[in-house]
Amino acid sequence: MSGKDIVLELLRRWGSQQSQGMSVEFVDANRQLPIAYRNTIANMMAEGEALNGIFAADEITYTWYERKGIRDLPYPRIAAGEGATFDIDETLSLDEVRPMIAKPFSPGNAFAAEEVARERIQFDKALIGSCTNGSYDDLLQAALVIYNAREKGLRKATRTFVVFPGSGGVARQIERPDPRLGGESIAEVFRSIGGQIRASWCGPCFGQGPDALAKGERAITSFNRNWQNRMGVGGEGYLASPAVVAASALAGYMAPPSELGLPWDPDVYGI
C-alpha cells in the first residue's frame, strides 16, 4: 500500500466532481502516513480539480524536517480552527485500500491492480518518477520489490524501465548503499535488472524528451495524470505506485507485486 494507491482510490470514489473547486484537508488520524505518501496524496488533488490539498503539520512533519537538520521553521503551523466547517466530511479506512492502477484517460479511472493483472495488459515502457513519486522513499519502495523479486529468480526487466529521480539530491542519494537493500544502492538495484536512470526532470510525464510515448505506445507509470496525449501524442498512459510499476516491469504485464509472489508486508516494503 502506498500514497499513490490511497489517492487513486479516493479519485475513483470521488469521480470528476466531488473535489472540484474545493480545498481538501487530510487528517492522518493514526499518524501513520510518511511524508512521501502525504506528498503524493496532496499533490494529486490537482487531478481531482481541487484548489489545494493539505496535511496540517504534525510530529511526522517536524521529525522529517529534523532529520534534514531543520529545526527552526520560519512559519507558524497552519491548521483548520476549532470552528471550521466542511461541506463534505469523509472517512477512508486504509484497510480498504489495495494496490491500484488507473487506466486511460483519467486518474479516477482506477481499478484494483489484481483485477487489472487478469487482463494481462501489455506495455512498452515502465516509468518511475514525477513530482508525485520521485522521492527517495518512493524509489526505495520500488527497489525493495525488485530486490525481493530477484530472490525468486526474476532478474531482468521485460520492458524498457526508466527512472527519473525527483531532484538532484535524490539522484545523488540513490547511488549510496541502503541497508534495507543488503548494502546495495537503489540505483544499483534498478540497473541490475536493466533499468536506466535519467536526469531529474518531468520528461515523458508531459510528453517531452526521448522517453515520451510515440503513437500506439503504452506505458505504466508513477506519474500524476494520464489524460489523452499527455505522455505523448497517440500514447496511452496508466498510473500506479512505484512498487506496482516495478512489479509490472518484471512481470511483462501490468500487475502488483503479489503477482510475483510478493504479498504486501509493511515490515518488508513499508517506508
Residue ranges, per PLM feature:
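Fe-S-dependent hydro-lyases/dehydratases of central metabolism
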Residues: M1-I271
